Amino acid sequence: MTASTNTLTITRPDDWHLHVRDGEAMRSVVPHTAAQFARAIIMPNLKPPVTTAEQALEYKQRILSAVPEGMAFEPLMTLYLTDNLPPEEIVRAKAAGVVACKLYPAGATTNSDHGVTDLRKIYPTLEAMQREGLLLLVHGEVTSSDIDLFDREAAFIDQHLIPLRRDFPELKIVFEHITTREAAQYVTEADRFVGATITPQHLLFNRNAIFTGGIRPHYYCLPVLKRETHRLALVEAATSGLPKFFLGTDSAPHAAHLKEHATGCAGCYSAHAAIEMYAEAFDNAGALDKLEAFASFNGPDFYSLPRNTGKITLVRESWTPPDSFAFGEAQLKPLRSGEALPWKLV
């Protein structure tokens, strides 16, 4: 890393948690990620979900076809865990270059209805993943109606993550988009088989952002933004230098009219300015010197993949993201639209 007061050059980063959808909508958003990141872990929660190696490879080709000419970008593919995903598919996935499987508790978030209803049902598949070296990516929230929305992550640790670690001690697990002090502490104290991603919105904002001046649906994501004490714990984890924590935007594009709705869907779109927002968060914490490891080194090291060799440069220059982007035939409202951002990718 090279840095001055107003310029920051780091190894080209990767995004270890990304949604790009499919079809024409996908073609609208892939260029934003490809402009910033060399690789990205692609979430499999399409309709229908990506549950076979063959489907993953077909999806990968569709994503690659949306990468603008002259840009180098590698989608890293995942499978969607269901109650019925057979262990044999894990072997085929490994051979096809799939790197991970995603665990969505049924009903936890967007397009998760096919998710796992009982972890015991997938133990043979998890055993195959541990044996083959595929990572387990978890949306760490319980879905029981008797658990408060803001407590679902902490409950997931006690009810599911601790038993998973006990029963599969050498299965690498990524606790995705952590949002709480409890999650940060759990990952910090866990062994080398546990890592975590953190989004830009959870580093920059607390739950007040959803309600300032009225309901602000474009700040609504799952897991939802939490109290300021939790945000500060996430900043401390991200800037700690610990290799367990790494960049994962969870950038989740939705048509604006489906966000600005009586039952608006969850997800923040950050791919247009992701690395700039991470730089802002690290700068606010006085920890720009820790950004490169978080954004560019910790993720590939955890996945046992080579680090990138290219560089990107950010400058301290105010700019304002547009109010909207095309999203297929609809419009997409990005996170921080119309707001001045202090760092800019050049």
Curated annotation (Swiss-Prot):
Metabolic or biological pathway: Pyrimidine metabolism; UMP biosynthesis via de novo pathway; (S)-dihydroorotate from bicarbonate: step 3/3
EC number per UniProt: 3.5.2.3
Active-site positions on this chain = D250
Cite the InterPro entries for this sequence: Amidohydro-rel, DHOdimr, Dihydroorotase_CS, Metal_Hydrolase
CDD domains the record matches = DHOase (cd01294)
Q: Which residues bind substrate?
A: H19, V20, R21, N45, H139, L222, H254, A266
Q: What does this protein do?
A: Catalyzes the reversible cyclization of carbamoyl aspartate to dihydroorotate.
* Protein name as it appears in the record: Dihydroorotase
Q: What is the lineage of its organism?
A: Bacteria, Pseudomonadati, Pseudomonadota, Betaproteobacteria, Burkholderiales
Gene symbol of the encoding locus? pyrC
